[in-house]
Amino acid sequence: MLIPEPILAHFPWLSLSIFFPIVGALIVPFIPDKGEGKEVRWYALIIALITFLITVAAYFKGFDPSQEGLQLYEKVSWLPDLGLTWSVGADGLSMPLILLTSFITSLAVLAAWPVSYKPKLFFFLILAMDGGQIAVFAVQDMLLFFLAWELELFPVYLFLAIWGGKKRQYAATKFIIYTAGSSLFILLAGLAMGFFQGGGMPDFGYTHLAQQNFGKGFQLLCYSGLLIAFGVKLPIVPLHTWLPDAHGEATAPVHMLLAGILLKMGGYALLRFNAQLLPDAHAQFAPLLIVLGVVNIIYAALTSFAQRNLKRKIAYSSISHMGFVLIGIGSFSSLGTSGAMLQMVSHGLIGASLFFLVGATYDRTHTLQLDEMGGIGQNMRIMFALWTACAFASLALPGMSGFISELMVFVGFVTDEVYTLPFRIVVASLAAIGVILTPIYLLSMLREIFFGKENAKLISKAKLVDAEPREIYIIACLLVPIIGIGLYPKIMTDTYISSIDGLVKRDLLAVERIRSDQTTIISNSNLSIGTIEAPLLD
């Protein structure tokens, strides 16, 4: 071997994976271009692929899945007078999502091949967003997290405002108002936690914050603000309305970034900050997360069923599936929380595949209205096969990743003895409604697109060519891990199970403290303690 293993293990892989695509983006304006954008497309693809290979190398050369603690850690003094340091690292919560980010971005660059309007700006934004999103999962400082969180807002805003559909300005403005406005809660909570001790220099590092003995009232206040901020990004109903509008106007590669990566930032942040750094507040808020998860599943599934616009139908389907992430995070079992983590990875792959196919179908039919489609299966048989495979993955067909992740959440929550049995039965029964609705609206969607009576006007005007090799390759790259995880989930769960176990143990200790307090209150007053805490009493 040319490079010794110790050097590879201590190589700054994460910093390289963050700055390489950002520096690559800065070079994009200087790429020679003959007017067709061919050169910049290949350049962006090479940069994105190298970034993906860097994250893969980080996993295999510097990351041990059996270890619970932080790995690949780098810390450099940045602005010491303000208590700011450049610190990055990875554990089981972040490493799978770092890999997912670089993988989806590489495919999004390939999906953006047909972009001809301002291609340099488009690929500049994709590469810059790649580095920013990896930073969200890799940084170990709350102020750095806030900066990385904000960095990805502007590329998405420009994607929507410049390359979006007819209502692009409305969708872009709504996106920036929701996400930038809610980000203020992250900044306020981060400053409050960093300055908690008072007197000395603030410390915003995750490790330092996890060791602080925050008061319960302080935790509840910070938890509430962070829940709003991360709930917008997840999204949680009723903070979700920006997402259908954004998806309704976005192009295929932007769809892939939104569904594949952006929504996962909210789920990751709930685990990293709310569950890990604020355990006492999480023990009290967890039942609310469960209820919100059920609302997400049922409301979004019913709304998706009623949608006649293809993009909005898939957008609401995404919101429904993210409800399982909320239930898993709200559970106090390693199996349930592990299922939430797997659901984020699974949905990232499945959501990216479905939205890419939506874009590919629109490029041919020039319509998103299901009422205007029908009977195109005879002309696009390979496209129909790709749609069918991805729809089956979304409806959680056994043997695919969606099935095992949702099953883990269900079983983990139902067997979680922290909650009372009646509460578990009611939640499981209601969530099952969403599981039943999903195949109904997805299979009916396939029927309306590909079967039934042909729309003569559509058939005569549209270029109904079948899937091209580039499109087949993108879907194949997404289906391989979807099926691989579905058949052998340990390949993914082993990556983060040690970190999940440590997180759940910390939260269970908080549950015991809450139970002790509740027992004291009940013995003294013999009164109900309220609906949020009641499910904790078993």
Curated annotation (Swiss-Prot):
Instruction: Give me the segments passing through the membrane.
Output: 11-31, 43-63, 95-115, 119-139, 143-163, 175-195, 217-237, 251-271, 285-305, 314-334, 340-360, 382-404, 425-445, 472-492
How would you classify this enzyme at the top EC level? translocase
Q: Where in the cell is it found?
A: Cellular thylakoid membrane
Report the main location listed first in the record.
membrane
A cellular-component GO term for this protein: plasma membrane-derived thylakoid membrane
The EC designation for this entry is 7.1.1.-
Q: How does it sit in the membrane?
A: Multi-pass membrane protein
UniProt keywords, alphabetically: Membrane, NAD, NADP, Plastoquinone, Quinone, Thylakoid, Translocase, Transmembrane, Transmembrane helix
Instruction: Please name the GO terms of the biological process aspect recorded for this protein, alphabetically.
Output: ATP synthesis coupled electron transport; electron transport coupled proton transport
Entry's Gene Ontology molecular function annotations: NADH dehydrogenase (ubiquinone) activity; ubiquinone binding
UniProt cross-references to HAMAP family, sorted A to Z: NDH1_NuoM
The job of this chain, per UniProt, is described as: NDH-1 shuttles electrons from NAD(P)H, via FMN and iron-sulfur (Fe-S) centers, to quinones in the respiratory chain. The immediate electron acceptor for the enzyme in this species is believed to be plastoquinone. Couples the redox reaction to proton translocation (for every two electrons transferred, four hydrogen ions are translocated across the cytoplasmic membrane), and thus conserves the redox energy in a proton gradient.
What this protein is called in its record is: NAD(P)H-quinone oxidoreductase chain 4
Q: Which organism does this sequence originate in? A: Prochlorococcus marinus (strain NATL2A)
Q: Which gene encodes it?
A: ndhD
